[in-house]
Design a protein with these regions (language model features):
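Redox-cofactor binding/interface segments in oxidoreductases and associated redox assembly factors
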Residues: 45-46, 96
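Glycine-rich nucleotide phosphate-binding loop and flanking beta-alpha elements
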Residues: 35, 52, 102
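Conserved Class I SAM-dependent methyltransferase catalytic core
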Residues: 78-124
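Residues that form generic nucleotide/phosphate-binding pockets
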Residues: 7, 11, 69, 85
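A short acidic (Asp/Glu
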Residues: 8, 56, 105-108
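Mobile active-site "lid"/loop adjacent to the S-adenosyl-L-methionine
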Residues: 48-82
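S-adenosyl-L-methionine
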Residues: 1-43
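Intrinsically disordered, low-complexity coil segments
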Residues: 16-18, 72-78, 86-88
Length: 124
């Protein structure tokens, strides 16, 4: 998203005096396309937006703004398709954050880490 990139870049530029941001490189690209071109990844951490539900809609006010920005730029949230693309990247491990009751993207999970409302599916 060009808008999100601009907002993040502006925030980073305003925080230049903080050491952690000095080594941060922000790239404006589709994450899946970029991951397929890049060759230096060992691990991918995939944290797709959770599907909307009545229960979590009230708690995700700030994320709703991000969803609106993506809709304005006609960027679709398709985590299943993104997972398929990211699965083709030659990496050692992929960690996928999912709602605890959500179906996994693939049945080839090597192991899982469970929390109260979230789980992490790990593919090796």
């Amino acid at each position: 998203s060009k808008i999100l990139f601009f907002l993040l870049n502006d925030g980073i530029n305003r925080s230049n005096n903080q050491e952690i941001f000095k080594s941060l490189t922000l790239i404006n690209a589709n994450a899946c396309s970029y991951a397929l071109r890049a060759t230096k990844f060992d691990i991918i951490y995939f944290d797709p937006m959770y599907p909307s539900s009545k229960k979590n809609a009230l708690n995700s006010g700030k994320l709703e703004y991000i969803a609106r920005i993506l809709a304005t730029e006609s960027i679709n949230n398709n985590p299943t398709q993104d997972f398929k693309v990211l699965s083709k990247v030659p990496i050692k491990k992929m960690i996928v954050k999912r709602p605890i009751k959500a179906e996994p993207f693939s049945q080839t999970i090597n192991y899982q880490v469970h929390g109260k409302t979230t789980r992490f599916d790990i593919y090796i």
